[in-house]
Amino acid sequence: MQEFDKSISFDGRDIRLKLGLLAPQAGGAVLIQSGDTAVLVTATTTKGREGIDFLPLTVDYEERLYAAGRIPGGFLRREGRPPERAILISRLIDRPLRPLFPNWWRNDIQIIATTLSMDEEVPPDVLAVTGSSIAVIQAQIPFYGPMAAVRVGLIGDDFIINPTYREVENGDLDLVVAGSPDGVVMVEAGANQLPEQDIIEAIDFGYEAVRDLIGAQYEIMEELGMEIAKAEPPSVDEALEKFISDRAADSIKKVLVQYDLGKAERDSALDNIKETAIEEAIAELPEDDPIKVTTSEDPKAVGNLYKGLTKKLMRSQIVDEGIRVDGRKLDEVRPISCRVGLLPPRVHGSALFTRGLTQVFSLATLGTPGDAQDLGDDLHPEDEKRYLHHYNFPPFSVGETKPLRSPGRREIGHGALAERAILPVLPPQDEFPYVVRVVSEVVSSNGSTSMGSVCGSTLALMDAGVPIIKPVSGAAMGLIREGKEVRILTDIQGIEDFLGDMDFKVAGTDTGITALQMDMKITGLSMDVVAKAIEQALPARLHILDKMLAVIDQPRPELSPFAPRLLTMKIDPEQIGLVIGPGGKTIKSITEQTGSKIDIADDGTVTIAAIQAKKAERARDLIFNMTRKLNEGEVYLGRVTRIIPIGAFVEVLPGKEGMIHISQLAERRVGKVEEEVAVGDEVVVKVREIDNKGRLNLTRLGIHPDEAAAVRKTF
């Protein structure tokens, strides 16, 4: 296509779109730019794959350091594996796109977003989301779009669209809203304990801006003469569908109302119906029967139609009767149990959070400032993280066997969400300088493990003695929409997540929301339904919080005896080199003497860590004496370092030497210095004079016995 260049004036900042400039062999390609941030988004599709029953969509977001005028480090001087932030942005693009493709589409779709240029104000993520919609439309892939996304910030009492990095950092809200013409399709947010109503207003505010961007895409389509591609769904074998329904529907209904069945028992019962009532019946049909011919040609046909029938019956039961497969009401939370301190104190904090069959074991570890995760290797201005949450989902948690791999996108995404939920309640760094890591091990899963990780993290932090501002709990909300009938489900379990239309995770304190994430399987939700889901989550969160506080209602007053003890002090930044010493000699000596770990910040903040408080105090005293200002008349216990004919040099503090003239060694006349002192001797001295060059003149004369006894040894 010919080059197309269009600028959209959007909330005080232009968004520039260029099509036909780059990647002519991609199905669709758009360069979307705001400020100095520019992202190339491409969409490509291929022919359908045989034998799959899912949408083969792949989304990748990539960052290049040339975008910020930098060269990668390392021997190869190339970008390595994508950082965690890039994986999270890939998910951010994927989640609003996926529900807008036909669920029966089986052609491979690949979306690649590459940041080509980046400034320090405009984040590339929401640009990439909006750009993906334009690229998909241009690629003529069937799509229920257009779709767009914006970020909403809160500065004071005012919402703003697409805030800068600094505005997000200084505000109380970081919310991304994506939507289609049918409504909201994705929400993700971190908030500083904002009330539900504020969050609802922010989403509504953001969706209005999304509608403007959708309108701009329609204008572009009109100018270019493009239309959104449509495709007809594959035909359904109605005879086979009726055959399955006639033989299985009643049996499925009976299983769905056996509320005492566990997850494994229910799954087994449903599988047994498919195997006996359907597959055995098909096997008994004549070889030339159309149904048998169909199933032999398409072995997955029975499974797909049976799954569709189960989904339909479960959803009808919820909509018509208001009863779920485990017998709960729509707004009822599964049974909860909480335990803390399950492991020996070598693990600094531990908690087991159980909700139904979902079980999360969270373990907290306290570290020193040097353990903070350095984030300075990518394009973003953030320096380091002092709170880390890692989420693990082993195969045994769902009774499966799989090879163990490094964390995938799902694990990284769930871990980041739970981390975001806790961040607003962490104590300030100057009050609690520890770096904290929580690992949530999902040991059993039946839905809502990410919110279980939030609850487990809170309990583990309190068990570890971390003085969090307030405890945080979380709940996952679901949705069933049949025509105009909408039912919102509280605390969804696995089957409801799998067969439902929404997974809306809400976390927060009794004051307000700290994090939320909404994913859809339908093409959009009205604001009324979004608001109702957020409001319905509140009593669930508070109920869960009550259960947690019944086990531990405040952080433990003491840390684990195996947690490091931290002391902080300030020194003049000009003295940092003195404390470190040539080649790190001085600081290494202090750490070896005291068994401590020392971190020094550029502003002169010194953090000392040791398992025993006395060792940390010893290191602090050494650094204090090393950096303190000496005054005339003060008495010290020093060590003789060398002798010259006219006197002896004494180190009174680490790195600080003075000289005792031979006449100041004793009351009597001294013929040779060696008569009074030798190298290595400890001597009590007084600062007699500090000359204009800062040199110390010391004396052993005129020191009262009480002063000598009170001197604290510095080496």
UniProtKB/Swiss-Prot annotation:
Keywords: Cytoplasm, Magnesium, Metal-binding, Nucleotidyltransferase, RNA-binding, Transferase. It comes from the Bacteria. Pfam families: KH_1 (PF00013), PNPase (PF03726), RNase_PH (PF01138), RNase_PH_C (PF03725), S1 (PF00575). Its cofactor is Mg(2+). Residues 633-701 form the S1 motif domain. GO terms for molecular function: 3'-5'-RNA exonuclease activity; magnesium ion binding; polyribonucleotide nucleotidyltransferase activity; RNA binding. HAMAP family: PNPase. This is Polyribonucleotide nucleotidyltransferase. It comes from Crocosphaera subtropica (strain ATCC 51142 / BH68) (Cyanothece sp. (strain ATCC 51142)).
